[in-house]
Swiss-Prot record:
Organism: African swine fever virus (isolate Pig/Kenya/KEN-50/1950) (ASFV)
Biological process (GO), any one: DNA-templated transcription
Primary role: Putative initiation factor. Necessary for efficient transcription elongation past template-encoded arresting sites.
Keyword Zinc-finger: yes
Lineage: Viruses, Varidnaviria, Bamfordvirae, Nucleocytoviricota, Pokkesviricetes
Name of this protein: Transcription factor TFIIS homolog
Protein family: Belongs to the TFS-II family.
Length: 243
């Protein structure tokens, strides 16, 4: 009986904000069917209630997700994600000295990722949410490998206030890391423009027919500071191999 009263109350609260009885009943019923205990039911329905009350979910957004309705991003999981962002930002002196600001930024960054994910259709909610949060966490990490230290554009802009934490979740890699994106684009352009003219040489032995009559070409398939990859073709048997 208590569970029935609780469900009626939740339906009333959801419908009050969504103003869509059919959609409200569909959300509530899906959460109820997924849960095998009252505790899990409340755990599943809570994100919908909170987002509706704070006007972070519109009818259109929920209808886009109505085919999958995955309320598995619980508050506990969101807390874990926020803790991940908090630990990452705390690695930087600026945020260690400004704990309150760090907490505010963490909440806004996570919320930005969460709301962005609601609008995606290609992947399931959980997969998209986890992937985006992981990407953002890597980008704002000040303890990157030495060759990535110059790519802290997003973190520096976050500290200076140029980048708003509530906007970070919907930004592309190129927008967050213009230096790294430009470097990557330059490498791709250079690779596409490189000369791939074939040369003949007896330096390379064919592993198939054991002859040393091969043509070869050099291709820059890795980073620019690493050696080129040499592709060989045996003129005797036509076998292709890497020199």
């Amino acid at each position: 009986m208590k569970m029935h009263i609780a469900r009626d109350s939740i339906v009333y609260l959801l419908n009050k904000h969504l103003q869509n009885t059919i959609l409200t009943n569909k959300i509530e019923q899906e959460c109820f069917l997924q849960a095998d205990t009252p505790k899990k039911y409340l755990q599943y329905i809570k994100p919908f209630l909170i987002n509706c009350m704070t006007k972070n979910i519109t009818t259109d957004l929920v209808m886009k997700d109505s085919k999958r309705l995955e309320p598995y991003i619980t508050l506990e999981m969101r807390d874990i994600i926020q803790m991940m962002f908090f630990r990452t930002l705390q690695k930087h002196t600026f945020f260690r000295e400004n704990t309150n600001l760090c907490t505010e930024y963490v909440q806004k960054i996570e919320a930005s990722c969460y709301h962005y994910t609601y609008q995606q259709q290609e992947k399931t909610f959980l997969e998209e949410y986890s992937t985006r949060c992981g990407m953002i966490n890597h980008i704002i990490n000040c303890e990157k490998k030495s060759h990535q230290q110059q790519d802290n554009d997003a973190l520096n802009k976050l500290i200076s206030g140029e980048l708003k934490p509530e906007a970070i979740g919907s930004m592309t890699f190129a927008e967050l890391c213009p230096s790294a994106a430009l470097k990557e684009k330059t490498e791709i352009t250079l690779r596409s423009q490189q000369k791939v003219a074939e040369k003949t040489s007896q330096l390379y032995k064919c592993p198939n027919c054991k002859q040393r009559m091969c043509t070869y070409r050099e291709v820059q398939t890795r980073a620019l500071d690493e050696p080129s990859t040499i592709y060989c073709t045996c003129k005797k048997c036509g076998h292709e191999f890497i020199g």
